[in-house]
Structure formats: structure tokens, C-alpha cells
């Protein structure tokens, strides 16, 4: 008879744990913590962080210099 009470209490505890974890997983604030996939919140945050093209003046300022040695101010020949 004691074994039946033990099995019943274990079953009840398991049901409570499963229900509480499923309720926490469906709440919006903890969704990304419980699920491994991306949520809509994280996708929106990634879109906000993307760098846009900018205006024409900003794009002009970011152009890479061209020439014989655009990465160095002084041209020093390579000697082995």
C-alpha cells in the first residue's frame, strides 16, 4: 500500500513539473531560453542591428583608395 502512495506522489510531481515547464516555455519573456530555435524577438533584434547602405555621401566616404599601395602610407619594397 505504501508503494501505491509513492507511485501516485511521483506521478503527481511529474505532472506538475511538466505543466510548469510548458507554461514557462510559452511565455514571451522566457521563450528564447527554453527553445533552441530563433524566436520572432531575436529575429527582430537582428534586423535592427543590420547595417544599412547609408546615403550617397556616406557611401562616397567609405570607398577604398586605389593606387599602387593603398594600404600603406609609405611604400617600402619587400626584400626577402
From Swiss-Prot:
GO terms assigned for molecular function: receptor serine/threonine kinase binding
Region (Disordered): 45-80
Region forming the signal peptide: 1-25
Keyword Signal found: yes
Hydroxyproline found at: 65
BP terms from Gene Ontology: cell fate specification; cell-cell signaling involved in cell fate commitment; maintenance of root meristem identity; phloem development; regulation of cell differentiation
Domain of life: Eukaryota
Name of this protein: CLAVATA3/ESR (CLE)-related protein 40
Gene behind this protein: CLE40
